[in-house]
């Protein structure tokens, strides 16, 4: 599936991933390939994602950490939409 992470400053990521975990209002939840469509609010926490060939632009690499093959990005809040196997995260 495609993951796009957008902040007010820039689009930080636009890459293929196999899973995405996000901090929802009622706790963390995960989306895998072909997940049902969803729109949800995100709270302060960590966005986590995995994939085989994730490409992060050099100028944004300092915003992400990698732990045990999983990329992580801290956010303050945001919104997530998954539709037609594409995840868009608008994050602060």
Model regions: which residues?
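Compact, glycine-rich, soluble single-domain proteins
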Residues: 2-92
